[in-house]
Regions:
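Non-catalytic accessory regions outside enzyme or core folds
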Residues: 1-76
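Residue-level detector of conserved catalytic or cofactor/ligand-binding positions
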Residues: 226-233
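Short, solvent-exposed loop/turn segments at secondary-structure junctions
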Residues: 171-173, 209-212
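Long amphipathic N-terminal alpha/beta scaffold segment
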Residues: 59-104
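Glycine-enriched loop-and-adjacent helix/strand subsegments that border the catalytic/binding cleft
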Residues: 95-98, 102-196
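Residue-level signal for alpha-helix termini/capping positions
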Residues: 91, 194-195, 227
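Short, glycine-/small-residue-enriched flexible loop/hinge segments at domain edges that mediate gating
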Residues: 195-210
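Charged helix-capping and loop-helix junction motifs
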Residues: 181-186, 215-223
């Protein structure tokens, strides 16, 4: 199968799962097909898929991710010893772990083609990530609390792991408790990375998107907590 054939296969199988989409026509243009495939992956509820589907999906995503360009740690600007700064798509990073700013459901973003980090990570990791996260949450039996962290395989991403954390939601004036919870996110991520022998971790700026944490304060806390961790023996 070439990439076009894989994409059409995946779209067709996902459409067949949803009776309401049975009469939907697959568009002819490549970019429109990619948008449709991403949307179908985004809205799909957790659930098993055939081994054939997963093999074709994994081959498709491997080529897509390689085509988007993989970025190694050696290519990133080092600000100080063991502290690096990079601006770009976190799903391209070939590091030990990337951090996902998740929601309390922990199974990804279900809004079709939404440009949040949660959606991007699940899109390029593949459907296995949602299923894996769902298994964790089914065993847990309650929504993920703010300020904690969970680690999963990265599946089709170039990193080894994804660390998921739920940041505080700011509505109105920033409070000390919200700052404490954001600090807890970073500390929990660093702790679980260490427990799993992760040698490099890429943080997004947690809670600064739709969760409305002030950007500058969030960035200062991220750098401070990273430096504290680096300085510890």
């Amino acid at each position: 199968m070439n990439q076009s054939e894989r994409r059409n296969y995946l779209i067709q199988k996902l459409l067949e799962e949803q009776p309401q989409y049975a009469k939907m026509q697959i568009p002819g243009r490549c970019e429109e097909q990619k948008t449709l495939l991403r949307a179908l992956m985004n809205v799909r509820m957790p659930g098993e898929l055939s081994e054939e589907f997963l093999q074709i999906q994994d081959a498709y995503l491997a080529e897509e991710n390689a085509g988007r360009g993989i970025v190694t740690l050696a290519e990133i600007q080092e600000l100080s010893t063991d502290l690096y700064l990079w601006k770009g798509d976190i799903t391209r990073l070939q590091v030990g772990a990337i951090v996902n700013a998740a929601n309390s459901g922990m199974t990804g973003c279900y809004q079709p083609c939404h440009n949040c980090i949660d959606n991007c990570i699940h899109t390029y990791a593949g459907i296995e990530l949602r299923n894996y996260c769902n298994d964790i949450m089914q065993r847990q039996g309650y929504a993920e609390p703010t300020g904690q962290a969970k680690i999963t395989p990265a599946f089709n991403l170039p990193c080894d792991y994804v660390i998921h954390t739920v940041g505080p939601i700011v509505q109105g004036r920033l409070t000390e408790e919200q700052e404490r919870l954001l600090c807890s996110c970073y500390e929990a991520c660093l702790r679980i990375a260490e427990e799993n022998n992760v040698e490099s971790i890429a943080f997004c700026c947690i809670s600064t998107g739709v969760f409305m944490f002030p950007n500058e304060i969030a960035a200062e806390l991220a750098v401070l907590l990273s430096l504290i961790h680096i300085s510890e023996p």
